[in-house]
């Protein structure tokens, strides 16, 4: 297993995509090997660090009011789907350490999300409508974020959701990945989990 090597510059998209898919494959491979106890301690530690670096790249390259490149979004989607499945493997195995990892990372509870315009080029008077789908996006455990609000123009859309049975989010704080006070959890925008949609004018 090789250490992940994400690019320093945000515009090195192809290299980033290659690394995301590589870690996704590692997640799937390690998940299968854990079932037969064929993962060395060194490989497992390197694997966890690669997951951490991938999540760190996600937070460091998620920009307020800007959509991700579609190819990058697709790569991250496959990574998060694989990580979600991996966490359930950890939870179901008779191993206290793996169970603890899954228990900390799989999140249920309230989350909040802002949608808005990152510049004044487009019409900022209209709030952005939520897109309900299975795409993993950034949410926060904190209901209010003045920093995010300061970066958006015009009308902002504020969402609240409650994750309950049968869903879980992936808590990035549990992996030690944090940006400011955002307390980030990744979770799709699933309509039945949404408890409130509010439009806030600047």
Language-model regions, residue ranges each:
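Mono-ADP-ribosyltransferase
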Residues: 1-202
């Amino acid at each position: 297993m090789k250490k992940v090597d994400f690019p320093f510059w945000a515009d090195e998209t192809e290299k980033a995509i290659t690394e995301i898919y590589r870690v996704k494959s590692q997640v799937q491979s390690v998940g299968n090997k854990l079932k037969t106890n064929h993962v060395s301690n060194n490989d497992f530690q390197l694997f966890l660090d690669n997951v951490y670096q991938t999540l760190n790249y996600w937070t460091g390259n998620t920009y307020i009011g800007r959509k991700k490149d579609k190819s990058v979004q697709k790569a991250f989607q496959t990574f998060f789907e694989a990580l979600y499945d991996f966490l359930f493997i950890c939870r179901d195995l008779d191993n206290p350490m793996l169970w603890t990892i899954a228990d900390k990372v799989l999140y249920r509870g309230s989350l909040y999300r802002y949608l808005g315009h990152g510049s004044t080029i487009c019409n900022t008077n209209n709030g952005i409508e939520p897109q309900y789908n299975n795409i993993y996006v950034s949410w926060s455990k904190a209901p209010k974020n003045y920093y995010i609000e300061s970066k958006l123009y015009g009308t902002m859309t504020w969402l609240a959701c409650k994750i309950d049975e049968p869903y879980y989010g992936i808590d990035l704080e549990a992996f030690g990945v944090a940006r400011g006070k955002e307390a980030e959890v990744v979770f799709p925008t699933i309509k039945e989990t949404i408890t409130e949609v509010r439009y806030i004018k600047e």
